[in-house]
Amino acid sequence: TSGTTADPKGVVLTHRNYTANVEQSLSRIDIPSSYRTLIILPLDHCFAHVVGFYIMIACGASVATVQIGATPMETLKNIPQNIREVKPNFLLSVPALAKNFRKNIETSIRAKGPFTERLFDFALRTAYIYNQDGYHKGKGWRILLAPVVGLFDLVLFRKVREAFGGSLEFFVGGGALLDSELQRFFYAIGIPMFQGYGLSEATPVISTNSPKYHWHKFGSSGKLLEPLALKI
């Protein structure tokens, strides 16, 4: 980690560090044993270990990894096919990966012609208004937009989600600050990207937004895990 002092260094993480962070993480997210995930991120970091592997193991859920190709580029090309095969319920993401997903979605929409592209843009803008900052989704007069957003979800956004296997409910984002615009985009298409915050020294999760109890807001790093004390 380059963590708190900017000089890269090794961090000693004990077995109990890991099991404690698993217990803490499960205070903010529920993982049914039927859940599946596909690990796309590098396997040599504690974020992928805790949120990708260990909380799934603790809950009896299923984990898959990307099929290794003959070259790094071939491995990357396996990701879309592996997502469709595994049909994950959630995925781990970092900003660079989220941007790439969005770029591919927009390229696919653009290929369907100008009418579909304009309709998709209008649907996005409508969903942005309805969702506001996530936490205040559909509040006040915005409730009137619910039928329109529901229709757009049925005819447009659901088809986008099918490219992710059709079962994807949310992303868990970490590694760096996730742009609020990216959060708005994925929230609009029905796959919220829940930003978290952590440090390698903390094994690593400290706080996160969550689908549980509607604990999420764009631009926020969410609620502290429990039990955990934080000093600034």
Where are these regions (language model features)?
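Conserved S/T- and glycine-rich ATP-binding loop of Class I adenylate-forming
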Residues: 1-4, 37, 42, 91, ...
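Conserved AMP-binding A3 loop
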Residues: 2-22
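Short, surface-exposed connector motifs at secondary-structure boundaries
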Residues: 5-7, 34-36, 162-169
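Adenylate-forming
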Residues: 10, 21-25, 100-105, 182-184, ...
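Short aromatic/basic micro-patch
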Residues: 12, 92, 224
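Alpha-helix/helix-capping structural signal
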Residues: 16, 96, 176-177
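Conserved AMP-binding/adenylation subdomain of ANL enzymes
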Residues: 19-36, 43-146, 150-157
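Conserved AMP-binding/adenylate-forming
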Residues: 128, 145-232
